[in-house]
């Protein structure tokens, strides 16, 4: 019974390690950090002036 509990704990820890990435291993995000200005966001999405896309 004790070995089963130990095995379950090991599986949980391994799952956590798999899902958690090292900070230096993290892939760079595709998009830059969005600015707080929503108009600038629409501008970058190229939706045009009708959607507040004036640059």
Swiss-Prot record:
<protein>
    <recommendedName>
        <fullName>Accessory gland-specific peptide 70A</fullName>
    </recommendedName>
</protein>
<feature type="site" description="Cleavage">
    <location>
        <begin position="26"/>
        <end position="27"/>
    </location>
</feature>
<feature type="modified residue" description="Hydroxyproline">
    <location>
        <position position="34"/>
    </location>
</feature>
<dbReference type="GO" id="GO:0005576">
    <property type="term" value="C:extracellular region"/>
</dbReference>
<dbReference type="GO" id="GO:0046662">
    <property type="term" value="P:regulation of egg-laying behavior"/>
</dbReference>
<dbReference type="GO" id="GO:0045434">
    <property type="term" value="P:negative regulation of female receptivity, post-mating"/>
</dbReference>
<dbReference type="GO" id="GO:0001664">
    <property type="term" value="F:G protein-coupled receptor binding"/>
</dbReference>
<dbReference type="GO" id="GO:0005179">
    <property type="term" value="F:hormone activity"/>
</dbReference>
<dbReference type="Pfam" id="PF08138">
    <property type="entry name" value="Sex_peptide"/>
</dbReference>
<feature type="signal peptide">
    <location>
        <begin position="1"/>
        <end position="19"/>
    </location>
</feature>
<dbReference type="GO" id="GO:0005615">
    <property type="term" value="C:extracellular space"/>
</dbReference>
<feature type="modified residue" description="Isoleucine derivative">
    <location>
        <position position="33"/>
    </location>
</feature>
<feature type="region of interest" description="Essential for binding to sperm">
    <location>
        <begin position="20"/>
        <end position="33"/>
    </location>
</feature>
<keyword id="KW-1015">Disulfide bond</keyword>
<feature type="region of interest" description="Sufficient to induce PMR">
    <location>
        <begin position="36"/>
        <end position="55"/>
    </location>
</feature>
<keyword id="KW-0732">Signal</keyword>
<dbReference type="GO" id="GO:0008343">
    <property type="term" value="P:adult feeding behavior"/>
</dbReference>
<keyword id="KW-0379">Hydroxylation</keyword>
<dbReference type="GO" id="GO:0046008">
    <property type="term" value="P:regulation of female receptivity, post-mating"/>
</dbReference>
<comment type="function">
    <text>Male seminal protein which triggers short- and long-term post-mating behavioral responses (PMR) in female Drosophila. Binds initially to sperm where it is later cleaved to release an active peptide within the female reproductive tract. Signals via the sex peptide receptor (SPR) in female flies; may also act via other receptors.</text>
</comment>
<keyword id="KW-0085">Behavior</keyword>
<feature type="disulfide bond">
    <location>
        <begin position="43"/>
        <end position="55"/>
    </location>
</feature>
<keyword id="KW-0964">Secreted</keyword>
<comment type="similarity">
    <text>Belongs to the Drosophila sex peptide family.</text>
</comment>
<dbReference type="GO" id="GO:0007621">
    <property type="term" value="P:negative regulation of female receptivity"/>
</dbReference>
<feature type="modified residue" description="Hydroxyproline">
    <location>
        <position position="28"/>
    </location>
</feature>
<keyword id="KW-0165">Cleavage on pair of basic residues</keyword>
<dbReference type="GO" id="GO:0019953">
    <property type="term" value="P:sexual reproduction"/>
</dbReference>
<dbReference type="GO" id="GO:0007186">
    <property type="term" value="P:G protein-coupled receptor signaling pathway"/>
</dbReference>
<dbReference type="GO" id="GO:0044703">
    <property type="term" value="P:multi-organism reproductive process"/>
</dbReference>
<feature type="modified residue" description="Hydroxyproline">
    <location>
        <position position="36"/>
    </location>
</feature>
<feature type="modified residue" description="Hydroxyproline">
    <location>
        <position position="38"/>
    </location>
</feature>
<feature type="modified residue" description="Hydroxyproline">
    <location>
        <position position="32"/>
    </location>
</feature>
<dbReference type="GO" id="GO:0007557">
    <property type="term" value="P:regulation of juvenile hormone biosynthetic process"/>
</dbReference>
<dbReference type="InterPro" id="IPR012608">
    <property type="entry name" value="Sex_peptide"/>
</dbReference>
